[in-house]
Amino acid sequence: MTNIQKTHPLMKIVNNAFVDLPAPSNISSWWNFGSLLGICLILQILTGLFLAMHYTADTTTAFSSVTHICRDVNYGWIIRYMHANGASMFFICLFMHVGRGLYYGSYAFMETWNIGVILLFATMATAFMGYVLPWGQMSFWGATVITNLLSAIPYIGTNLVEWIWGGFSVDKATLTRFFAFHFIFPFIIAALAMVHLLFLHETGSNNPTGISSDADKIPFHPYYTIKDILGALLLILALMILVLFSPDLLGDPDNYTPANPLNTPPHIKPEWYFLFAYAILRSIPNKLGGVLALVLSILILVLMPLLHTSKQRSMMFRPISQCLFWILVADLLTLTWIGGQPVEHPYIIIGQLASIMYFLLILVLMPVASTIENNLLKW
């Protein structure tokens, strides 16, 4: 009798990706985040779909429609807060996933890595547009400030910003198009994620040692399916604790005030997961310079395979690189804290030093440390 899961064209793809996939026997929980990101994406698409059924993308009614969802729609409050905090969980998983890739040298799979960087950009764009939709004060002013950054592009900047706005300021046209893009982007992300997996399955997964695991593979199911289910349960537990106990912990109180173009909030800041990039942007006094630093702070990930000077792929056996990696993590946490602080002494200088440190660590110190470690191997 033929096994349908190995013969049916569709089932065969699923089987080869999630059941009979040969996986390294030693991958740790740091390899759980890929599946967790998939769960986050599905959760966001589903909650987003139900929110879209009740939301109106019009400047006069957007804020009221979100209030209506929370007060009058059956379980609307939990759907709204799962969506808002689901974005936070999404970015926590994203940062962990990228951090894992940096630590264990997963960027050696260049196609997979580059698609991942595109996915990161797409997710950030989606989250930004989603933050504009409730049309609170921070939504409006966040949209104004961030889109305005494009005016720093020489010659075409101003025209580009007005084209994106659909007018001379952030208004009804902007909100409508942001809603349209925010709806379509997660499906583009899902398609890109499939390409990401396609490229990953061409090479197979990396593992903590960074050594080829071809000699010791185990089937994905049941070993890693059960491991992923544990990860998923912990993710959902963390999300539901956040949603049910402190749903507004990561939000901004200003967003409970309807958007008012005549009243600027004292401190305009994005959601917490963009604060590190926002701090880098603010640390440069020049507008164009700040925008370039902002883009490069993420785009620098593309250079990781080129900056890898070590003879070993993983950092598992490289203590100096490990030390620098954790300094980089601490630096990013510092930038996140600074991004949420007002622009005044001593925060300005701390932000500037942390920004310099960020680029210095990635572009200079880590490649140099790798070279030193290579020479230490000869001892």
Swiss-Prot record:
Q: Name one GO molecular function term.
A: metal ion binding
Gene3D superfamilies recorded: Cytochrome Bc1 Complex, Chain C (1.20.810.10)
Cellular component terms (Gene Ontology): mitochondrial inner membrane; respiratory chain complex III
Residues annotated as binding heme b b562 are 83, 182
Keyword vocabulary terms for this entry: Electron transport, Heme, Iron, Membrane, Metal-binding, Mitochondrion, Mitochondrion inner membrane, Respiratory chain, Transmembrane, Transmembrane helix, Transport, Ubiquinone
Under which name does UniProt file this protein? Cytochrome b
Q: Taking the first listed entry, what is the main subcellular location of this protein, grouped into a coarse class? A: mitochondrion
| Subunit annotation | The cytochrome bc1 complex contains 11 subunits: 3 respiratory subunits (MT-CYB, CYC1 and UQCRFS1), 2 core proteins (UQCRC1 and UQCRC2) and 6 low-molecular weight proteins (UQCRH/QCR6, UQCRB/QCR7, UQCRQ/QCR8, UQCR10/QCR9, UQCR11/QCR10 and a cleavage product of UQCRFS1). This cytochrome bc1 complex then forms a dimer.
- Any note on cofactor binding? Binds 2 heme b groups non-covalently.
Function (record text): Component of the ubiquinol-cytochrome c reductase complex (complex III or cytochrome b-c1 complex) that is part of the mitochondrial respiratory chain. The b-c1 complex mediates electron transfer from ubiquinol to cytochrome c. Contributes to the generation of a proton gradient across the mitochondrial membrane that is then used for ATP synthesis.
Phylogenetic lineage: Eukaryota, Metazoa, Chordata, Craniata, Vertebrata
The GO annotation for biological process reads: mitochondrial electron transport, ubiquinol to cytochrome c
Q: Which residues cross the membrane?
A: 33-53, 77-98, 113-133, 178-198, 226-246, 288-308, 320-340, 347-367
Which InterPro entries does the record associate with it? Cyt_b/b6_C, Cyt_b/b6_C_sf, Cyt_b/b6_N, Cytb/b6-like_sf, Cytochrome_b, Cytochrome_b_C_euk/bac, Cytochrome_b_N_euk/bac, Di-haem_cyt_TM
- Note, other: Heme 1 (or BL or b562) is low-potential and absorbs at about 562 nm, and heme 2 (or BH or b566) is high-potential and absorbs at about 566 nm.
Q: Which organism is it from?
A: Philantomba monticola
